[in-house]
Amino acid sequence: MSYTDPDDSLPEHVPGEAEMSAQKEAILKQILEPQARMRLSNIRMVKPETAAALESHLINAASQGRLAGKISDEHLKQILQSMQKPRREFKINRR
């Protein structure tokens, strides 16, 4: 009878995820001004999927060299607005 260590059954990708998360945070810290980082963390608390999409967009832009300098809070707002789906407006006319 052989004994199997319960720790062996843990997935191997957990340390990799922590490293990727740390790398992502380091990159975002380099490309975002403090106010923009604060806004991104607030968005992450409310809408994690939007924050993840925004983070990947920013990291891709930075890796392709499309960013000139750090991103300000105002620029981050513009990027967010461009990423959002257009909303329909309904007008109700009363007679």
Swiss-Prot record:
Domain of life, source organism: Archaea
NCBIfam families membership: PRK04239.1
Family assignment from sequence similarity: Belongs to the PDCD5 family.
SUPFAM superfamilies for this protein: Double-stranded DNA-binding domain
GO cellular component, one term: cytosol
Protein name: DNA-binding protein CENSYa_1764
Keyword terms, alphabetized: DNA-binding
Region listing for Disordered, in residue ranges: 1-21
GO terms for MF: DNA binding
InterPro entries to which the protein is assigned, alphabetical: PDCD5-like (IPR002836), PDCD5-like_sf (IPR036883)
